[in-house]
UniProtKB/Swiss-Prot annotation:
HAMAP family (UniProt xref): MurB
Species per Swiss-Prot/TrEMBL record: Pelotomaculum thermopropionicum (strain DSM 13744 / JCM 10971 / SI)
Cofactor section: FAD
Presence of keyword Cell wall biogenesis/degradation: yes
Residues forming the catalytic site: R176, S226 (proton donor), E296
Key words of the record: Cell cycle, Cell division, Cell shape, Cell wall biogenesis/degradation, Cytoplasm, FAD, Flavoprotein, NADP, Oxidoreductase, Peptidoglycan synthesis
Gene name in the database record: murB
Full protein name: UDP-N-acetylenolpyruvoylglucosamine reductase
Length: 313
């Protein structure tokens, strides 16, 4: 565990915002994860900066999460400080054809605000869980659309507590990637460029995206969305299904019978259960197709023991 002083000092720095031993399963869409040593929900960017500066000064491990929709947390929890960017940093504002959204704004909320303003571009976000911070960081996308294409500029915070702005080009967006994944940077706010569109057309397209998602994805069970990135020219779901793993179950984790790139929690799944299925899917696809699947979900906490156990199954 981190030093007990970390909790006391942060609690004094941000009264009412800090908790010890917070169960991380409450903060991930998989509903999986052990306790974090220290858990902080900042109210605004200045409080976020204070936490980051404190962690840097004390050399404490720091993890930043949003809605936890693309995240697997170890059963043993997280040693360090977990910062959740949520309601305290969720403002959305519209200026002409531009939308400014803070990192904690829900994707569904941004899409709805754009639709109400008659601004197109965010329709593909309909039904996707998550927040702007995580979605921009990983350049989230669906149905051939990617969020990075709409970004004009972002406000970032580095792990030394310094704010900086970067353009779309400087963010170096790629398939499910950006510079945020390769450097100690936190997205604080993003400016998006949209285009005028008929409100009814926006509504109808969002309904089509949502209907398609309901037909093809296991929305009735907790999951983290796509587990693996799609390899060039193919999809991870197809490869896993062709390898015969659709429906495979370990404990209460199951490779979805509806979409093989989803692993669902049927009730009380653990990170160990999920990791076992991840290992089996990787091994089966590599053996049959010679394709090495790469994770799209992020794993935090010490999962080495779980991985070792999974490989022995």
């Amino acid at each position: 565990m981190v030093e007990p002083a970390f909790y006391r000092e942060l609690a004094e720095l941000l009264p009412g915002r800090v908790r010890a031993g917070e169960p991380m399963k409450k903060h991930t869409t998989w509903r999986i994860g052990g306790p974090s040593d220290v858990f902080v929900e900042p109210e605004g960017r200045e409080e976020l900066r204070r936490v980051v500066c404190y962690a840097s000064r004390r050399d404490a491990p720091l993890y930043v999460i949003g809605n936890g929709s693309n995240l697997l947390v170890a059963d043993g929890g997280v040693r360090g400080i977990v910062v959740k960017i949520g309601k305290g940093l969720s403002r959305i504002s519209i200026k002409g054809n531009k939308i400014i959204a803070e990192a904690g704004a829900r994707l569904a909320g941004v899409a709805a605000a754009a639709g109400e303003a008659g601004l197109g571009g965010f329709e593909f976000l309909a039904g996707i869980p998550g927040t702007i911070g995580g979605a921009v960081a990983m350049n989230a996308g669906a149905n051939g659309f990617s969020l990075g294409n709409l970004v004009e500029e972002v406000l970032l915070l580095d792990f030394h507590g310094e704010f900086c702005r970067k353009t779309k080009e400087e963010m170096k967006f790629g398939y499910r990637s950006s510079i945020i994944q390769k450097a100690p940077l936190i997205l604080v706010e993003a400016l998006f460029s949209c285009y005028p569109r008929n409100k009814e057309e926006i509504r109808e397209e969002m309904e089509r995206f949502l209907a398609r998602r309901k037909l093809t994805q296991p929305l009735c069970y907790p999951s983290a969305g796509s587990v693996f990135k799609n390899p060039p020219g193919d999809t991870a779901g197809r490869l896993i299904e062709m390898a015969g793993l659709k429906g495979m179950r370990v404990g209460d984790a199951q490779i979805s019978t509806l979409h093989a790139n989803f692993i669902v929690n049927l009730g009380s799944a653990t990170a160990r259960d999920v990791l076992a299925l991840i290992e089996k899917a990787r091994e089966a696809v590599l053996a049959r197709f010679g394709v090495e699947l790469k994770l799209e979900v992020k794993i935090i906490g010490n999962c080495q023991a779980e991985v070792a156990e999974c490989r022995s199954l």
